[in-house]
Amino acid sequence: MLDIRLIRKEPKECESRLQKKDPAISLERLLDLDKTVRQLKADSEALLAKRKVLSGQIHKAKVANENADALIQEVNTIADQLVAFETTLQEQEALLEDLMARLPNYPDEDVPVSPDKTGNQMIKSHGEVPTFPFPPKHHMQLNEALQILDFKLPAKTTGSGWPAYCNEGVLLEWALLTYLLNKQQAHGFQLWLPPLLVKRDILFGSGQIPKFDGQYYRVEDGDRSLFLIPTAEVVLNGFHSQEILNEQDLPLCYAAFTPCFRREAGAGGAHERGLVRVHQFHKVEMFAFTTPEQEEVVYQKMLHVVEEILSELQLPYQLSLLSTGDMSFTAKKTIDAEVWLPGQKAFYEVSSISKCGDFQARRSETRYRDAQGKLHFVNTLNGSGLATPRLLVAILENYQQADGSVVIPSVLRPYMNNQEILLPKTVR
């Protein structure tokens, strides 16, 4: 949520900044509604003041045994006006709040302006894209022999886009997750296994709704609805909603492992088959609450963790600064870490590290008290640390051998009983 006071003070500047993300954004209707709401409040306060004066006059008239019928009639008329004003005010405030809730975060000044991902800037490249002395296989082709993933059986029970891990695929997935969690803990992140279902207001606080309403799996629980989380960012942000934190306790750096649920799987087309885009996947998510002064330090820390993981896995990767048209609704700056997938012949995002400023904190009402006792909104940051499906794809495709086997990265072997290689089922 943005600060309405700044929009009132600098409407043109705010509109210009927002149009970097979406050129169609106009603040004209919002400002008109804001004026209407403020005028209604002023008129209501004037009527309340007038009623108070009249009530005093009625009291004096009664004490003096004077006729107060006209005064009483005027007070009754004011009461009816106040009821009408309150109804109109509630309607106009709801419209204003909805417009405010649909405005994205302002992008930082150093973010490239572009309508889409073509404006993203590659800021770092690490490792060499592998060349194979044989035709490299897509991970789905490798899986035919390895048999570590199953897409047919879960398609019967649930539908397409819901893969199941099996055999050594289960062990490799858990090895990867254990390694990721250990890495987060080593860097001082507090580990969490949070709930997978959240209330609607928690989705609102993280910025998922109302803009993306209807894109989340919903569970009916009696007279209320709960939603399956698309990322642990949602629940971690909600942990301190409507709270006042102490400045000396900041930054709070959390890392959570959760399954994530997204309805848009398959949106990338048939070429993104397999694990590249699915409805349910595992992810370790980093999330932090900071002061504005701590924000950049924690941001660099998150970037460092992601780079360390990809370097230790010995996967070729690049970092891209996202343009305004490719950033999320809540972010003011995002750097994507992308790994090379030979099967796609392209780099694919495995982590997004974002600064959100006080955007989510305003929606969630998360503040901190400084040493002087003043209240401020916290800043929030988030970053995938990391999502495993594409990471697993990257391992399978980059570590594949001519015979269809896959070498297990050395950093994962301690979590797989020191197993060094995945062999095709036919040679096991």
UniProtKB/Swiss-Prot annotation:
Q: Which Gene3D superfamilies match?
A: Bira Bifunctional Protein, Domain 2, Serine-tRNA synthetase, tRNA binding domain
Subcellular localization, as worded in the UniProt entry: Cytoplasm
Binding positions for L-serine per the UniProt entry? T231, A232, E233, E285, S384
This protein's UniProt keywords: Aminoacyl-tRNA synthetase, ATP-binding, Cytoplasm, Ligase, Nucleotide-binding, Protein biosynthesis
Q: In its keyword annotation, does this UniProt entry include Cytoplasm?
A: yes
Pathway(s) of this molecule: Aminoacyl-tRNA biosynthesis; selenocysteinyl-tRNA(Sec) biosynthesis; L-seryl-tRNA(Sec) from L-serine and tRNA(Sec): step 1/1
Q: Which reaction does it catalyse?
A: tRNA(Ser) + L-serine + ATP = L-seryl-tRNA(Ser) + AMP + diphosphate + H(+); tRNA(Sec) + L-serine + ATP = L-seryl-tRNA(Sec) + AMP + diphosphate + H(+)
Can you tell me which family this protein belongs to?
Answer: Belongs to the class-II aminoacyl-tRNA synthetase family. Type-1 seryl-tRNA synthetase subfamily.
The record's listing under HAMAP family reads: Ser_tRNA_synth_type1
PANTHER family given in the database record: SERINE--TRNA LIGASE, SERYL-TRNA SYNTHETASE
Q: What is this protein called?
A: Serine--tRNA ligase
What's the gene? Answer: serS
